[in-house]
């Protein structure tokens, strides 16, 4: 399928005599045996003009992402409905190596020419920063010491790449991340949102959430969730609200069919098998529903995980202790729904997404209320 995108681009470049390279994630993915669906192409020439011409030639859509940097995107949907992206940008710096040194991580700082990427020559990337060596060693390393400061959204990408490729940040990378953390506040909310959704889609998601907390990222992105730490609850709860929340996310991930085991699954209640058995006859219909996109590249499964993550954020503000020592959170679901909506608005989620999550948080106590009713009192309408 990349040929349907890159061969027309190759012809455009041949016609215009501009030089270009495929760089970044597509090169990395090809090296580890993955078939990419997005391609970064660096051009020594007018990248926006080429992007517009490519979109016209293949029947795709063209967007300007950064006019000053000559950064454009082409989006194309295959006959099977799969979405592909080609990002074209003008080369920064006087050489290919200088351009690579301005990128985020060494694993994304490898490039090949279009002929090699399309199979017309040996696939031997230009790799001056030893990104392939880091990929094989499981290291996540910055291209430059100030890479996080240059673009703080890379802080979230670091967590995502660790989870997606089984990497670990080097000590120097972690130190640089800590120093750059305050810069997350100046990142456009839409960019934070996109990284958060991508993290939610990589199982086991709780591992990434714990990593975000350890690194101090969670309070910067979802302070309402970070504030759940240490908020105690009465029996039958055995964890504080924060740990309860993470285990709810893990349970939701299993409910959604994740095949990558999460350590939190070992503490699921005995009746969990009954729940899964009850769902089995309708499994295909459930999956079809979960995979529906509520917004571009945002399937409903991501919103279900997000709702699980936010479902109890109203508890700290509603916590009371009865004379007998019992802890209560009256109307926490209503308060939590309002706060969840505010947080998602701040992150520029769509109105449809906000409504779905808000409804789930507001009504998350209903199944419990129905379950504890005597059988004869359960009514359906």
Regions found by a protein language model. Name each.
Residues 1-381:
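Catalytic cores of the polymerase beta-like nucleotidyltransferase superfamily
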């Amino acid at each position: 399928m990349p040929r349907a995108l890159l061969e027309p681009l190759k012809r455009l470049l041949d016609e215009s005599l501009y030089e270009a390279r495929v760089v970044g994630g597509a090169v990395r993915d090809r090296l580890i045996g993955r078939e990419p669906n997005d391609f970064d192409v660096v051009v020594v020439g007018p990248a926006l003009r080429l992007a517009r011409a490519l979109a016209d030639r293949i029947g795709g859509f063209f967007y300007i992402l950064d006019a000053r940097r000559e950064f454009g995107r082409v989006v194309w949907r295959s006959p099977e409905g799969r979405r592909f992206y080609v990002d074209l940008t003008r080369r920064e710096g006087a050489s290919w190596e200088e351009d690579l040194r301005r990128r985020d991580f060494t694993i994304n700082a490898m490039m090949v020419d279009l002929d090699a990427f399309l199979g017309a020559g040996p696939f031997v990337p230009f790799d001056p920063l030893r990104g392939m060596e880091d990929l094989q060693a499981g290291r996540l390393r910055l291209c430059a010491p100030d890479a996080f400061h240059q673009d703080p959204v890379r802080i979230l990408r670091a967590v995502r790449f660790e989870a997606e490729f089984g990497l670990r940040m080097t000590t120097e990378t972690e130190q640089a991340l800590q120093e750059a953390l305050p810069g997350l506040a100046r990142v456009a909310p839409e960019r934070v949102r996109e990284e958060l959704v991508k993290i939610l889609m990589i199982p086991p998601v709780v591992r990434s959430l714990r990593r975000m907390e350890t690194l101090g990222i969670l309070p910067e992105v979802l302070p309402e969730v970070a504030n759940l730490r240490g908020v105690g609850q009465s029996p039958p709860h055995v964890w504080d609200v924060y740990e309860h929340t993470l285990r709810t996310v893990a349970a939701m991930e299993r409910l959604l069919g994740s095949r990558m085991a999460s350590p939190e699954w070992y503490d699921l209640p005995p009746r969990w098998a009954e729940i899964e058995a009850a769902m089995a006859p309708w499994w295909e219909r459930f999956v079809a529903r979960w995979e529906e996109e509520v917004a571009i590249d945002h399937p409903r499964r991501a919103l279900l995980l997000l709702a699980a993550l936010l479902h109890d954020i109203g508890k700290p503000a509603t916590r009371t202790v009865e004379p007998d020592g019992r802890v209560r959170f009256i109307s926490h679901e209503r308060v939590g729904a309002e706060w969840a909506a505010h947080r998602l608005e701040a992150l520029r989620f769509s109105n449809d997404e906000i409504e779905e999550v808000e409804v789930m948080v507001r009504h998350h106590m209903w199944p419990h209320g129905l379950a504890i009713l005597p059988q004869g009192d359960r009514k359906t309408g």
